[in-house]
Amino acid sequence: MCAPLQQRGDIQLDFLPLQPAQPYPFPWPFLDFFRIFPETVLMRPQPLLPLAVDSSKRYDLVILAYQVWFLSPSQPMTAFLASPEAAQLLKGTPVVTLIGCRNMWLMAQEKLKQRLNELGARLVDNIALTDACGTAASFLATPLWLFTGRQKPYSWVPRAGIDEAEIAAASRFGEAMAQRLTADSLPIERPMLTGLGAVRIDEKLIASEKVGNRSFQLWSRLLAALGPQQSRRRAVGLVVYIAFLLCLIVTVVPLSALLKKLLAPLFKERTQREKAYFAGPSGE
């Protein structure tokens, strides 16, 4: 996506890596991955290394690229948005968000939008790139990638991650941004990526995300109350939660999916309104 911007001699593109003070492992041990669940969902930032940025500098556009962890912005992005540097950099600045995730990003984006509003930033576009192997297959493929470090650890598992062709095709977004940035010196106030397929909304996942987010909020508060990340009590609580989650997935989730399919005709108009809302500001 950034290639068209980098190739322009009349555009200065700066990169700011967000480095956790305590690096996250990859592959990620199973229980350690869940230990950060409460802080991630509750958006309690974990420390970053000092940010190598001049926060007094004014930018015409800021692109925030982040992953989704537990239906929430990843910890590094949460920490950045809580920093004094972000408060200075983003105030009054047009922002484009770029999401890379398995398939569910709506609730994470809602949380990030709220934080951007608090900082006085202006969200003008959103891009979401999701796993190519589909919702059902990625439910297995993505965790295996996370815990083994390999995108295709077994021959019978589809390759996890965003398709290379989709990543290459994202250059169209960079081209649209470059065209707008060089068109004039006026502030960017309107979406630049309308009609380019910046996001795709799967209406079947909207209700699931809302229910999942409410459940995550409840369990996060309970687990956080048990003790710090490395405490024995939190580990025991996490084992109970993971067992509960697995039971939920094999029982309630299939029944819920069937029920939603049967009731879909009754909520068609509402679903279309929700799709249009979550597709904003860029649209499908």
Residue ranges and their predicted role:
Residues M1-A65, L71-P76, A82, K91, ...:
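N-terminal beta1-alpha1-beta2 submodule of the flavodoxin-like/Rossmannoid cofactor-binding fold
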Residues P25-F30, Q109-E110, T135-L140:
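Short aromatic-enriched loop/helix-cap "lid" or pocket-rim segments at secondary-structure transitions
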Residues I36-T40, Q114-R122, T142-Y154:
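A polyampholytic, Gly/Pro-enriched intrinsically disordered region
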Residues Y66, I99-R102, A160-G161:
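Second-shell loop/turn segments in exported
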Residues Q75-P84, Q109-Q114:
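"Short basic amphipathic alpha-helical interaction patches in structured regions
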Residues P94-T135:
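Short, glycine-/small-residue-rich phosphate/pyrophosphate-handling segment
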Residues G134-V211:
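Glycine-rich phosphate/pyrophosphate-binding loop and the adjoining helix
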